[in-house]
Curated annotation (Swiss-Prot):
It catalyses: L-methionyl-tRNA(fMet) + (6R)-10-formyltetrahydrofolate = N-formyl-L-methionyl-tRNA(fMet) + (6S)-5,6,7,8-tetrahydrofolate + H(+). This is Methionyl-tRNA formyltransferase. The keyword Transferase applies. Attaches a formyl group to the free amino group of methionyl-tRNA(fMet). The formyl group appears to play a dual role in the initiator identity of N-formylmethionyl-tRNA by promoting its recognition by IF2 and preventing the misappropriation of this tRNA by the elongation apparatus. Pfam families: Formyl_trans_C, Formyl_trans_N. Keywords: Protein biosynthesis, Transferase. The keyword Transferase applies. The gene is fmt.
């Protein structure tokens, strides 16, 4: 049974904590938890523990927070736990080969895509950005490459037309733990089957940047709408009006609508939203956040700032 495995867990954010919680609930033998060092957060910039650390401490699990696993002291902490396997979920630190070789059965990773599609740092966001109709989680053996290890298990999740990165993150956080438990059971029983990735099918999920969140009105409306959902809740798509950034939390595509106006031109502003000409089609903005304000419906924004959204105005 998988509860006989001595497991090291390594992870940092809430997504990882949900997987650790599943291991704890299933009475797995977690012998140590690795997570990133406490970071300053909040208005007071106080040192704040990660969700994984908070959960581990509530269950009296040993916690280790090395700044790096490349140094001997961090590697020694792993070695002294005599683990059978190391489970890595959104840890945020690179595991050198010396660490990958320490557990008897190696290290496995929970990755938020259907590998080999979307290897890399932002698989959830890139799946939305590209218009994929499905994604999922892959449990893989870890090697020295970037998400290149052999695959042990996949769980598929449909992407809905209104999914954001936040909603898709939650969906994957729900299916990932069961996939992990199933994989551990197979490994413990000696029944796990590893499937090599087809490198010819690989795509890469580059890390997000604030710069690419700026809306380029020359793109098609459908692509812009996907960008808005992909960059929610971070870094949030935006445009500029009178040199002030306005964040876009939600938008829709006006099906069948076309415009001969220059991309970025406001075509209309009504209760349905602010209609913008794009490189192909019309985008309707429905939830905005002016600088220094909270996010609000377009109707509320127009009630106070309608003069800023006169048809014919061209947005930056």
């Amino acid at each position: 049974m998988s509860d006989s495995l001595r497991i090291i867990f390594a992870g940092t954010p809430d997504f990882a904590a949900r997987h650790l919680d599943a291991l704890i609930d299933a009475k797995q033998q977690v012998v140590g938890v690795f997570t990133q060092p406490d970071r300053p957060a909040g208005r007071g910039n106080r040192l704040t523990p990660s969700p994984v650390k908070e959960l581990a401490e509530r269950h009296d699990l040993p916690v280790f927070q090395p700044a790096s696993l490349r140094k001997p002291e961090g590697q020694r902490s792993v070695a002294e736990l005599n683990a059978d396997i190391m489970v890595v979920v959104a840890y945020g630190l690179i595991l050198p080969q010396a660490v990958l070789d320490l557990p008897l059965l190696g290290c496995i990773n929970v990755h938020g895509s259907l590998l080999p599609r979307w290897r890399g740092a932002a698989p959830i966001q890139r799946a939305l950005w590209a218009g994929d109709d499905r994604t999922g989680v892959t449990i893989m053996q870890m090697d020295a490459g970037l998400d290149t290890g052999a695959m042990l298990h996949k769980a598929v999740c449909a992407i809905q037309h209104d999914d954001t990165s936040a909603s898709l993150y939650d969906k994957l956080a729900q299916i990932g733990p069961n996939a992990l438990l199933s994989t551990l059971t197979q490994i413990a029983a000696g029944r796990a089957v590893a499937e090599s990735q087809d490198n010819a099918l690989a795509t890469y999920a580059d890390k997000l940047s604030k710069e690419e969140a700026r809306l380029d009105w020359r793109l098609p409306a459908a692509q812009l709408e996907r960008c808005i959902r992909a960059f929610n809740p971070w870094p949030i798509s935006y445009f500029s009006l009178a040199e002030q950034p306005i964040k876009v939390w939600a938008a829709g595509v006006d099906d069948g609508q076309t415009s001969s106006h220059a991309p970025g031109t406001i075509l209309a502003a009504d209760k349905a939203g602010i209609h913008i000409a794009t490189g192909a089609g019309v985008l309707t903005l429905t939830q905005l956040q002016p600088a220094g304000k909270k996010a609000m419906s377009v109707q509320d924004l127009l009630n106070s700032r309608r003069e800023s959204f006169i048809p014919g105005t061209v947005l930056d």
